[in-house]
Amino acid sequence: MTHQTHAYHMVNPSPWPLTGALSALLMTSGLTMWFHFNSTILLMLGLTTNMLTMYQWWRDIIRESTFQGHHTPVVQKGLRYGMILFIISEVLFFTGFFWAFYHSSLAPTPELGGCWPPTGIHPLNPLEVPLLNTSVLLASGVSITWAHHSLMEGHRNHMLQALFITIALGVYFTLLQASEYYEAPFTISDGVYGSTFFVATGFHGLHVIIGSTFLIVCFFRQLKFHFTSSHHFGFEAAAWYWHFVDVVWLFLYVSIYWWGS
């Protein structure tokens, strides 16, 4: 290997982009097979290969950053820009759901009874489980900030405690959301109200699960002393993502649960 005279990371050839693309093909084909032929074999194969690809790709990134020192300040800056752009793309993703909700609710069609919520729909009480969920996520936003500041100040045990609390609150939120779905008096097939409600809150719930997984990985990495007060972009990205999930929920709560009811 020749001597490197720049701060950029020249990535070694990797099989994971190819396996990731093939797993995406398997998943989309599997969804089609599931919808039309009620067969989930291809979908399960696609999900399994996708999970394995993500695990091994991120494992390689951790090796490159933590053990090989390839993530110089310049590389970290690029990763930060990448994470910011990813979160912006997620904002636009959720914008579509809010657009659908407000388009349907501000000018309800005569077929819905000319009112919102549509005739026959009994919306959930925003002052019960949804308000508890809001409190849980706001508390998790405080604890993740506590964890971040503890890490920057070198208080490892405090960081682990705060991160564990955040993960526990994330799991609690997911369980509350699942119980709310189970007890909801309407379904995703109950017109535009049901579809916009379950798609918007369901995708948010998926993002909470992804964010919780992200934080669990950071917890185990911190147990192995992977983060320092000056080199912890993996945790920083997880914290940014969690704050994004928090903010999206506040908009969902105000729009769909409170105003929409």
From Swiss-Prot:
It is a multi-pass membrane protein. InterPro entries: Cyt_c/ubiquinol_Oxase_su3 (IPR024791), Cyt_c_oxase_su3_dom (IPR033945), Cyt_c_oxidase-like_su3 (IPR000298), Cyt_c_oxidase_su3-like_sf (IPR035973), Cyt_c_oxidase_su3_a-hlx (IPR013833). The keyword Translocase applies. The chain crosses the membrane at residues 16-34, 41-66, 73-105, 129-152, 156-183, 191-223, 233-256. It catalyses: 4 Fe(II)-[cytochrome c] + O2 + 8 H(+)(in) = 4 Fe(III)-[cytochrome c] + 2 H2O + 4 H(+)(out). It comes from the Eukaryota. Its EC number is 7.1.1.9. It is found in: Mitochondrion inner membrane. Keywords: Membrane, Mitochondrion, Mitochondrion inner membrane, Translocase, Transmembrane, Transmembrane helix. GO terms for biological process: mitochondrial electron transport, cytochrome c to oxygen; respiratory chain complex IV assembly. GO terms for cellular component: mitochondrial inner membrane; respiratory chain complex IV. Residues 35-40, 106-128, 184-190, 257-261 are mitochondrial intermembrane. Residues 1-15, 67-72, 153-155, 224-232 are mitochondrial matrix. SUPFAM superfamilies: Cytochrome c oxidase subunit III-like (SSF81452). GO terms for molecular function: cytochrome-c oxidase activity. Pfam families: COX3 (PF00510). Component of the cytochrome c oxidase (complex IV, CIV), a multisubunit enzyme composed of 14 subunits. The complex is composed of a catalytic core of 3 subunits MT-CO1, MT-CO2 and MT-CO3, encoded in the mitochondrial DNA, and 11 supernumerary subunits COX4I, COX5A, COX5B, COX6A, COX6B, COX6C, COX7A, COX7B, COX7C, COX8 and NDUFA4, which are encoded in the nuclear genome. Belongs to the cytochrome c oxidase subunit 3 family. Component of the cytochrome c oxidase, the last enzyme in the mitochondrial electron transport chain which drives oxidative phosphorylation. The respiratory chain contains 3 multisubunit complexes succinate dehydrogenase (complex II, CII), ubiquinol-cytochrome c oxidoreductase (cytochrome b-c1 complex, complex III, CIII) and cytochrome c oxidase (complex IV, CIV), that cooperate to transfer electrons derived from NADH and succinate to molecular oxygen, creating an electrochemical gradient over the inner membrane that drives transmembrane transport and the ATP synthase. This is Cytochrome c oxidase subunit 3. It comes from Tragelaphus strepsiceros. The gene is MT-CO3.
